[in-house]
């Protein structure tokens, strides 16, 4: 059970890493209408990044889209602002994460 729980939380690391790679902000994307690598489900969007880096999906595969729930959790935790269409790291979290 411990291994499963650790893997569940890893999805947040995947999202936060994408946000840092993109200067603190990334599109949420859309996995309900597109397959991985197409339309709004590319690797630079949160849904595409989760599909590839967390779920191990390959280009052209169908994906699930848990972004609305995960975005709300990151907002509640004070890690990222859950905005319409994108997530953005909070200034406070960036400062703590960068060790300043």
Locate each region found by the language model.
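Long, low-complexity, charged/polar intrinsically disordered regions in eukaryotic proteins
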Residues: 1-35
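A short, conserved structural fragment
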Residues: 71, 75-88
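Short, cationic-aromatic polyanion-contact patches
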Residues: 85-100
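Amphipathic alpha-helical interaction surfaces
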Residues: 21, 25, 56-57, 76-80
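Short, surface-exposed, charged/polar-biased interaction segments
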Residues: 32, 36-37, 91, 95
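Short, well-structured alpha-helical interface segments that form or flank functional binding sites
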Residues: 7-10, 14, 65-69, 75
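Short helix-coil junctions and helix-kink-helix linkers
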Residues: 37-65
